[in-house]
């Protein structure tokens, strides 16, 4: 049995932060990331830093067969390697290592990104292009969500979507900007572990759980919606916590038949939710009012747009120490705070 102890702010659990204040990441401060290269694919490659609106702010060329390694301009612990098949970006923080592999085809189109933590793959992202060579879709598959979230906490990750596209705000924004102008764009996010898939076609966002009974239908064309509902520090990126992160009066319907437990911070945001047999409530329903109740022994009611909310039995302090225990497959088995066991997981 392995143990890891993380001390964080309760409302930023697993987010790698020590402050409850949510601050926007400035893309200009991010490490340079690969964007669409112009000219010959090999041996010329361009790397650039982009702003939120996709404007290049820094660019340099990577030229020649003999130049197989470059480092970030600030001399930080980030190294780029060209293997012949992909660009490998390796970053270190303490004894943790993150590797991003950016794949390009012979016409310089960015086609795939893979994310590894300590040599273990967490995410695969595939990009599709139309006949004109423009980006038309993105598919993100979570290979190991616990590994992804654990790395997020230790490496100081941002929103889940930023992690899924390489924990780069600039990269995620330019991808979404290109999708915004694509004809019939498609975005798919799924988890191989939990059989989840979530699709967005530019107008509607729908979701289903393959190995369960849950469905979500969101009627909106707001591109920022993705970043809003995915920006949750949660190790099981389940469907309920995504919905609960929504702010505002978006048309929303959620019906599910499963066991859910959620804890909320003082700003009515869930910082921990779990699909597990923790409580015995069933047949939950969440509609436009964004209020959830249950018929079991524990009442959970929250309104993200309203003024009131009921928390179940344990108080939230500004800072708590959480101890995560997990098995040899890297799945959590227990969450504790001091001597109090907060959650146990069905194995």
Question: How should these model regions be labeled?
Answer:
Residues 22-347:
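Buried hydrophobic residues that stabilize the cores of well-folded domains
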Residues 4-13:
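Sec-dependent N-terminal signal peptides
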Residues 16-19:
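C-terminal motif of bacterial Sec signal peptides marking the signal peptidase cleavage site
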Residues 1-4, 22:
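Positively charged n-region of N-terminal signal peptides that target proteins for export
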């Amino acid at each position: 049995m392995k143990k890891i102890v993380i001390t964080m702010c309760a409302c930023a659990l697993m987010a790698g932060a020590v402050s409850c204040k949510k601050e926007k990441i400035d893309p200009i401060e991010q490490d340079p990331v690969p964007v669409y290269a112009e000219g010959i694919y090999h041996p010329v490659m361009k790397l650039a830093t982009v702003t939120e609106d996709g404007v290049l702010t820094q660019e340099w060329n990577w030229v020649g067969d003999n130049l197989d390694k470059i480092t970030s301009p600030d001399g930080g612990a980030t190294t780029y390697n060209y293997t012949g098949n992909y660009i490998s970006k390796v970053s270190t923080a303490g004894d943790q290592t993150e590797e991003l592999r950016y794949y390009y085809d012979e016409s310089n189109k960015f086609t795939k990104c893979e994310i590894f933590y300590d040599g273990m793959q967490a995410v695969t992202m595939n990009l599709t292009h139309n006949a004109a060579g423009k980006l038309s879709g993105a598919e993100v598959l979570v290979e190991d969500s616990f590994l992804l979230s654990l790395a997020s906490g230790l490496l100081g990750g941002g929103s889940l979507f930023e992690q899924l596209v390489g924990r780069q705000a600039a990269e995620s924004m330019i991808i979404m900007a290109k999708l915004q102008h694509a004809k019939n764009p498609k975005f798919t996010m799924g988890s191989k572990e939990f059989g989840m898939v979530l699709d967005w076609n530019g107008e509607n966002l729908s979701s289903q759980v393959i190995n369960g009974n849950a469905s979500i239908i969101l009627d909106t064309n707001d591109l920022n919606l993705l970043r809003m509902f995915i920006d949750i520090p949660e190790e099981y990126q389940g469907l309920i916590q995504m919905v609960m992160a929504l702010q505002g009066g978006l048309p929303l319907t959620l019906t599910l038949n499963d066991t859910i437990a959620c804890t909320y911070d003082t700003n009515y945001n869930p910082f921990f939710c779990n699909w597990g047999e923790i409580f015995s409530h069933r047949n939950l329903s969440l509609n436009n009012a964004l209020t959830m109740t249950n018929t079991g022994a524990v009442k959970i009611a929250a309104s993200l747009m309203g003024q009131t909310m009921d928390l179940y039995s344990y108080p939230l302090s500004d800072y708590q120490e959480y101890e995560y225990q997990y098995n040899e497959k890297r799945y959590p088995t227990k969450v504790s705070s001091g001597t109090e066991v907060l959650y146990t997981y069905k194995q």
